């Protein structure tokens, strides 16, 4: 269970953590802190607070790709029935590209049905003619936004739909609506090559990569299992089942708890 908003950096109390783990079904609670001598940076928080955001502030590649999307695609807010009717291809092909096996109709319907029930959740879509070739899912509360997910079809990637969606979201919320913060989440705890590509993409479209310390607190019943032997076993299973997201996440949590390894993105 990750604290929301993700970008909150104040330390929670011990009582708060105890109550969350006791009353939820979560095996682990996670939150962010400012790095210090006791909490070294081990993750990146992707965040934009620039209320003067514009294309001219981006790199040459960032401007080029956002403009390409603007010429090729129609980008707008989309309602949930539209996502459910037209978004499966973008979702499924994205999950396959990142090596995950859950790009199924059942997972798509379950995920976005549940997500759509919260009135603070919405979506932005990119259309190419009558095809929804990409969409972003958002959490919008008070004066902040978190990008929860981003999905695009394989045959649309030359049009840079994700760049166009990011530009739309930053322009709409920071400039038009004068929000304070747009967050694009955290670097992954999973040992995956895609992490480097995502890091470069998020910086290209206008987000700062803020070094943070990501802390994990295991449920008391699981703490005896956080040991080097279990970590070694988790790494072996990850090699045998590289598409198993749960095992990859568990391995990442154990690495952070036992080795406190700074993320390679810090270098």
Predicted regions and their residues:
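Active-site/acyl-donor-binding loops of N-acyltransferases
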Residues: 34-55, 182-267
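Acyl-donor binding region in acyl/amide transferases
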Residues: 1-41, 53-56, 80-83, 139-213
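A conserved beta-strand-loop-helix scaffold within acyl/acetyltransferase catalytic domains
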Residues: 31-39, 48-159, 167, 171-174
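Residue-identity detector for threonine
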Residues: 6, 10, 82, 89, ...
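Charged/polar, solvent-exposed surface patches and flexible loops
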Residues: 19, 64-71, 85, 89-96, ...
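Short N-terminal signal/transit or membrane-insertion segments
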Residues: 1-10, 60-74, 142-146, 236-254
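Short, charge-rich amphipathic segments
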Residues: 1, 14-28, 41-52, 93-107, ...
């Amino acid at each position: 269970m990750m604290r929301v908003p993700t970008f909150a950096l104040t330390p929670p109390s011990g009582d708060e953590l105890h109550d969350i783990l006791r009353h939820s079904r979560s095996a682990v609670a996670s939150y962010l802190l400012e790095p210090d001598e006791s909490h070294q940076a081990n993750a990146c928080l992707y965040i934009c607070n620039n209320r003067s955001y514009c294309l001219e502030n981006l790199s040459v590649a960032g401007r080029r790709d956002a403009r390409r999307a603007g010429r090729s695609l129609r980008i707008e807010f989309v309602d949930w029935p539209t996502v459910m009717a037209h978004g499966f291809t973008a979702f499924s092909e994205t999950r396959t590209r990142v090596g995950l096996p859950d790009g199924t109709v059942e997972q798509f319907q379950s995920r976005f049905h549940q997500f759509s029930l919260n009135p603070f959740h919405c979506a932005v879509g990119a259309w190419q003619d009558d095809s929804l070739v990409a969409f972003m899912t958002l959490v919008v509360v008070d004066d902040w936004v978190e990008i929860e997910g981003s999905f695009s079809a394989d045959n649309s990637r030359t049009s840079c739909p994700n760049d166009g969606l990011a530009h739309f979201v930053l322009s709409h919320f920071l400039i038009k609506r004068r929000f304070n913060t747009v967050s694009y989440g955290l670097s992954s705890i999973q040992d995956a090559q895609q992490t480097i590509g995502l890091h470069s993409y998020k910086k290209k479209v206008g987000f700062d990569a803020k070094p943070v310390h990501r802390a994990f607190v295991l449920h008391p019943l699981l703490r005896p299992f956080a040991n080097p032997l279990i970590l070694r076993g988790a790494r072996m299973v990850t090699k045998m089942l590289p598409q198993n997201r749960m095992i990859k996440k568990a391995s990442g949590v154990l690495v952070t708890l036992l080795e406190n390894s700074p993320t390679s993105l810090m270098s």
